[in-house]
Amino acid sequence: MSLTDTSPTRRPAVLFALILLAWATSSPHPAVAQTSAEGDQTPARLLAAAKSWGYQLHKFDPDTLAASPYDMLVIDYSRDGKPARALTPEEVDKIRVKPDGERRIVLAYLSIGVAQTYRYYWKWYWGWVFGVLSPRWLGSENPEWRGNYGVRYWHEGWQKIILGGENSYLERIVKAGFDGVYLDGVDEYVDMVKEKRNARALMIAFVKAIAERARVLKPGFLVVPQNAEALLADASYRAVIDGIGKEDLLFGDDVSQQPNDPKSIVSDVVRLKLLTADHKPVFVVEYLDAPQEIERARRRLERYSFIPYFTDRALDSMRVGDVPAPDHAADKK
């Protein structure tokens, strides 16, 4: 039933949703309170002040990334997921400088709820013979994304891979010089509730452990999860993260380019605005091709004070032309 339904049984819920959405669109840009100190270049303040971002995980070139205009980039730590082709600290430093000489934030993609077969940690025999040779933490393969396996992320074996020492995934990223991590697979807790009743709490604890370990290694290290916006209801979770990424907010939550259900959008926006109320940014990626849809989506996302980016779902190219003009932020006030 649409949000315009005025039947007596629906009217209170609809009115409440519209009030919440009005609040969501009236909140100030999260960067306002975060950038009061002139010239402050801490990673958290730079992230909060970002007006644009880009997202590419495959087929990237450091020179092309460095030439992009975005205030924040999310990339893989390696060209192919393996150490031999990992970006060097020198390459990361180059990417961190925009063409105009200004500093930008560079986050490394890190999947903490899904194991991927092209990663350095993967053993060729995992998943074979009905999984009898697989570690206990390895779940089933996602039929829609071949080579991606859900994980029991609370298991010591998986957590050791992610944050368990100098050869851990996290430490490789820190040593390469990234400003932070962009955590994917956080929403895996939804599927794991059937195995662990406290799967939600265990995921929050895992994200907190990653943040704590990373900031011991590198003070000010940024932690930005993707999706799982329902976790934002937990104030302690919001306190430990520096922002959030959200896929398919307006379009394509069924992996199409069709508009999402209006009620679902309202619900997600209200959750995401919990973070902007804490003066932390929300980065939205929409996988759209049609210029008219992109422009409409951009205007709507900017009304929410979210930072939009538009690209292909394969994430194997960097689109340009989505960067606002210098005075663009003023248009949103």
Language-model segments: residues:
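Bacterial N-terminal signal peptides that target proteins for export
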Residues: S2-L15
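Short, intrinsically disordered low-complexity segments
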Residues: T9-R10, P28, R103, W145
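Bacterial N-terminal signal peptides
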Residues: L15-S27
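Signal peptide processing junction and immediate N-terminal pro/mature segment
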Residues: S26-Q34
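Glycan-processing catalytic domains of CAZymes
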Residues: Q34-K333
